[in-house]
């Protein structure tokens, strides 16, 4: 179990309350697929993701980005039990989808970049970033737990 300070809980909750999952999710997944093109192999069912323009205009990419952020909302709501919250999702990504667990970290970085770009230094302060990065690290660890 992770020990969260009251300040960390408040920072995560406050930041999450400002995030539009319909904006940040698609941006983050788009960024992942463009900046780290080897991740595209996990999204073959999404149709054309072979060019930046195709990725930017792909509705399946946008929808899955929203889905990813919905998953993060579950973690925000279950800060004290993120490991169990993500157990089935971790198992699915490991056993069915065969996603390299390092990609979770890479996507988390893309999410942070998008959040920082959206909110800037007035909202995404160093203290908020510290709590947010800790949160994402716990999520990434939980997603990687079912890997052998």
From Swiss-Prot:
Keyword list, A-Z: Heme, Iron, Metal-binding, Oxygen transport, Transport
Segments forming domain Globin: 3-148
Chain residues that bind heme b: 64, 93
Coiled coil: none
GO BP annotation list: hydrogen peroxide catabolic process
Superkingdom of the organism of origin: Eukaryota
Pfam families: Globin
Job of this protein: Involved in oxygen transport from gills to the various peripheral tissues.
Subunit and partners: Heterotetramer of two alpha chains and two beta chains.
Protein name per its UniProtKB record: Hemoglobin subunit beta-A
Gene expressing this chain: hbb1
